[in-house]
Amino acid sequence: ITTTGKENIPQGPVVFVANHQGYFDIPLMLTQLDKPNPLVAKKEIQKIPMIRGWMEQLHCVFLDRDDPRQSMECLRQAQELLGQGYSVVIFPEGTRNSGGPLGEFKAGAIRMATRAGVPVVPVCIDGSHLLMKKGSLWIHPAKVNIRILPPISTEGMARDEIRALPEQLRQQISDELDRLRG
């Protein structure tokens, strides 16, 4: 695992916005950033007792992707964590992309940062989908690159800038993936 760009993590709470390639992205975000941070994760993870316990200890919030009302409540809880001084990790694609093209970045995932007025830190993950391929129970050796990109301030952002932010972040991470892959 090669992680670069830790110097781009500002002091204070931020929202880390990362692409989501594979099952190991959550442990990677917990171990490769400046410190373990709460994550926004799908509610299905709560069914795995060992993982649920430590995620609850980290103040992670669980999102029901099929319930828009609960999803809004989840993002409100994440925004509260930001107000308490925690940083939050989110995967705005909402699902794994298995190393393929990035999916759409959901605006709601970014909205908590703009409402809290905290910076957004884009994080590019490449190679994590190779550690455990979809449908496999085996862990495989793989080269994983994580690049922490410069933060984007959300303080005082105009409405049109806020609307453009999800696509801007998606494009930044996609461009970084292209650079990593040469």
Residue ranges and their predicted role:
Residues 72-182:
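Non-catalytic C-terminal accessory region of glycerolipid acyltransferases
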Residues 3, 16, 39, 146-148:
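Generic preference for hydrophobic
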Residues 1-14:
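Membrane-anchoring hydrophobic helices of lipid-metabolizing enzymes
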Residues 6-8, 29-31, 52-53, 79-80, ...:
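Short secondary-structure boundary/capping segments
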Residues 4, 40-42, 64-65, 92, ...:
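Thr-Gly-centered strand-to-loop micro-motif
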Residues 8-11, 47, 68-71, 152-157:
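A short acidic, often aromatic-flanked loop/helix-cap motif at beta-alpha or helix-coil junctions
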